[in-house]
């Protein structure tokens, strides 16, 4: 997943990720967490809210930067999957 999200410094908002299964098979997300970092330094981390096939993360970046990374780790059945999103703060 190569997605990019923009924030204006001072914003506090939700990022929603939709998880899809290959071949539209039914599935359940059993757990999900995130890390929000810049150059390897973690600024925020926690659990995602799970709503059916959506993962909800609320972020409030502390500094302007073009290079934040949001990494989401979630579990479906017996597999662990990850998604990365680039976050720019202007």
Regions found by a protein language model. Give the residues of each.
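Contiguous segments within soluble domain cores/interaction surfaces
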Residues: 1-90
